[in-house]
Regions:
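Low-complexity, acidic/polar, glycine-enriched regions of mature
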Residues: 15-187
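Bacterial N-terminal signal peptides
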Residues: 2-12
């Protein structure tokens, strides 16, 4: 339940290549799923604040930095949202953003298959590997320019980031992250 925020992403890397895409925050979200009591799955979503992408399909290179707004956590239940924002979970008073920074895209032929990076949440940074479910670039008729985007998944252990609440009485440590990302080519 808690570590969906995991994909909080930030802009701090020094890149040899300049970012050539800007993250579209209206199409970029981190969703999470966390089981509890062996019954149902809790789900929620975090919005993104900012981010950049460098992508070169010909060179088979990619880098991404995304900043996530942890205070935007939305489960559809106001009480649970407030609980997740508190000190027992995401402590948004001290850690209002999270970030994901990657400097390695893995390709299978011409397709992006994985994105390796570092996830920072609650001031702790750990490596994660995002598996591409799909990724593509196309000419967007609204923006009249190229947009690249895709869906990625990974499973993390929230205890690595210090989110321990509920582990002793039925909330699972494993959190599945489902990341939707779109980025618009800069002119």
């Amino acid at each position: 339940m808690a570590l969906a925020g995991a994909l909080a992403l930030g802009c701090s890397l020094t890149w040899a290549q300049a970012p050539n895409y800007a993250i579209d925050p209206t199409h970029t979200f981190v969703n999470y799923e966390n089981g509890h009591y062996g019954t149902t799955t809790n789900r929620g979503r975090f919005s993104t604040k900012d981010g950049t992408l460098y992508f070169d399909r010909e060179k088979k290179e990619g880098k991404v930095e995304i900043v996530m707004d942890i205070s935007s956590v939305n489960t559809g239940v106001d009480f649970l949202n407030r609980q997740l924002q508190g000190k027992d979970f995401f402590n948004v008073a001290d850690y209002s953003t999270g970030k994901f920074v990657s400097d390695k895209f893995v390709f299978d032929g011409d397709k992006v298959s994985e994105v390796h990076g570092q996830l920072t949440l609650l001031g702790k940074t750990h490596p994660v590997v995002l598996k591409a479910q799909k990724f593509n670039c196309y000419i967007n008729p609204i923006f009249k320019g190229e947009v690249c985007g895709g869906d990625f998944e990974t499973t993390i252990m929230r205890s690595q980031w210090g989110v321990m609440w509920g582990l002793q009485f039925g909330f699972e440590d494993a959190v599945k992250l489902i990341i939707q990302i779109e980025a618009i080519k800069m002119k």
